[in-house]
Structure formats: C-alpha cells, structure tokens
C-alpha cells in the first residue's frame, strides 16, 4: 500500500519541479528587452542633427545628436545604435548601447564622429536607431555631405 502512494507522489513532485522554469518564463516579456516575449515595445527617435555646416571634409570631426523616447506604458530595454553610411554604401557602426527606460522616459544621445580621411566623397547619411532584440522599432537619419 505504501508503494501505491509513494510512487505517484514522487511523479507529481518531479513534474512540478520540471514545470517551475516554464511558469517563471511567463512572468518575463513585457515591452522591450531582448529575447522572447510577445510584445516588442514602442520607441521614438527624433531626427538626428549634426554640428557641421552643410559639408565636411574627410579627416574632420562632427557631433551627432538625437533623442530616443520609450513610448510604451512600461519599463523597457532598447539597443540604441548610431551608424554612418558613406556615399559608397559602406556602413560604420559608431556606437551601440543597451539603455533601460522607464515608461515615457527620453534620453539625449550624442556621439563625436571623426570622418575618416579616405571616406568616399559625396552625400552620405548618419542614422540613429532603436531596437528591441533584433526588431527595429524606430530610426532617424540626417544627410552628411563629405567633400
């Protein structure tokens, strides 16, 4: 009689212990952050501005400024990247950071960029983008004329 009670009890305890990680995963997710979760979040990126005049020479530096806002109603973690694309189509990632936002919170983003002397001359662009995991939520760009 003891075996009839002990074996089913052990099976139930083992199943409960195995199911605990699955229940813990359900609490994760929400908006933002990397990994699973059904919701991707909400971000706004203001169009970036640059500190140069209309044209910049290779070898000179320029300042890049933008604002990134969490437009979701909860906390979120977004990856914010700043990149430059030359007129030849070569992309350079200038900065990439994971930033934790509260609901409605904004951050001002700035980066100094030394344009390489051998950069292709012509109209390029600077991009500021916000990602939740691998999903791009928002991006802003500004033209950068290299002469």
Predicted regions and their residues:
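Bacterial N-terminal signal peptides that target proteins for export
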Residues: 1-11
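Bacterial N-terminal signal peptides
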Residues: 11-19
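Ser/Thr/Gly/Pro-rich low-complexity, disordered linker/stalk segments of secreted
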Residues: 25-40
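Short beta-strand and strand-turn-strand segments in soluble, beta-rich domains
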Residues: 44-46, 85-97, 119
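Short beta-strand segments of immunoglobulin-like
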Residues: 50-56, 98
């Amino acid at each position: 009689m003891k075996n009839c009670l002990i074996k089913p009890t052990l099976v139930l305890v083992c199943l409960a212990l195995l199911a605990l990680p699955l229940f813990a995963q359900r609490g994760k997710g929400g908006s933002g952050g990397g990994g699973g979760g059904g919701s991707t979040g909400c971000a706004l990126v203001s169009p970036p501005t640059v500190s140069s005049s209309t044209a910049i020479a290779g070898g000179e530096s320029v300042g890049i400024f933008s604002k990134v806002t969490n437009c979701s109603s909860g906390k979120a973690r977004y990856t914010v990247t700043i990149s430059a694309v030359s007129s030849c189509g070569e992309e350079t990632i200038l900065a990439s950071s994971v930033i934790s936002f509260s609901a409605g919170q904004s951050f001002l983003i700035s980066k100094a960029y030394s344009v390489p002397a051998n950069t292709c001359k012509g109209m390029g662009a600077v991009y500021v983008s916000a990602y939740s995991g691998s999903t791009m939520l928002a991006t802003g760009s500004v033209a950068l004329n290299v002469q």
